[in-house]
């Protein structure tokens, strides 16, 4: 039976995630209100503007029910702004910005600069594969990880060693990435995550 995956559809790149998920055989639901969380096997928090997503989640009374669902074990794939929304700490939070505080990391927003500084590359991601295509658009970076957080992806440093910025982590049922896997033709991130979701169903 195909898993039912919710995609938070308040703002940002949710349509691209839906397209990839459906191409891999998943059923999808756009999530805007707490009732949309019922019966989900997994949920995606897409990229976009983290401050806007935060305000809309609170305006639509989605933040607390979503927080509760994730704490109960609902599998999560968070990309770019979705990572920011989950973090316990932000180095450069906007005035009045809240997070769900579900992922024990510190994040610096827009760490790679403006939209003009966006770039594409490949990453080796533990549990996903080597040479995975990744698109970074005004991407955040993870500057601290808590003791229960596994680092699964880092950018290469100037010498080509994989010891640069942390751009992917896993903590229990949460997979969080700085980049946009949905903006590439490489579906391995979604495919791997869906396999894990299906195993939980």
Curated annotation (Swiss-Prot):
Q: In which pathway does it act?
A: Cofactor biosynthesis; pyridoxal 5'-phosphate biosynthesis
Task: Name the chemical reaction catalysed here.
Answer: aldehydo-D-ribose 5-phosphate + D-glyceraldehyde 3-phosphate + L-glutamine = pyridoxal 5'-phosphate + L-glutamate + phosphate + 3 H2O + H(+); L-glutamine + H2O = L-glutamate + NH4(+)
Q: InterPro entries, per this entry?
A: Class_I_gatase-like, PdxT/SNO, PdxT/SNO_CS
Q: Where is the active site?
A: 80, 180, 182
User: Which GO-annotated molecular functions does the record name?
Assistant: glutaminase activity; pyridoxal 5'-phosphate synthase (glutamine hydrolysing) activity
Q: Which SUPFAM superfamilies match?
A: Class I glutamine amidotransferase-like
* Entry's Gene Ontology cellular component terms: cytosol; glutaminase complex
Biological processes, Gene Ontology terms:
glutamine catabolic process; pyridoxal phosphate biosynthetic process; pyridoxine metabolic process
Gene3D superfamilies under this entry?
A: 3.40.50.880
- Pfam families associated with the record: SNO (PF01174)
Give the matching CDD domains. GATase1_PB
Q: What EC number(s) does its UniProt record assign?
A: 4.3.3.6, 3.5.1.2
Keywords assigned by UniProt? Glutamine amidotransferase, Hydrolase, Lyase, Pyridoxal phosphate
* Role description: Catalyzes the hydrolysis of glutamine to glutamate and ammonia as part of the biosynthesis of pyridoxal 5'-phosphate. The resulting ammonia molecule is channeled to the active site of PdxS.
State the family it belongs to.
Belongs to the glutaminase PdxT/SNO family.
* Cross-referenced HAMAP family: PdxT (MF_01615)
Q: Per its record, how is this protein called by name?
A: Pyridoxal 5'-phosphate synthase subunit PdxT
What is the originating organism of this protein?
Cutibacterium acnes (strain DSM 16379 / KPA171202) (Propionibacterium acnes)
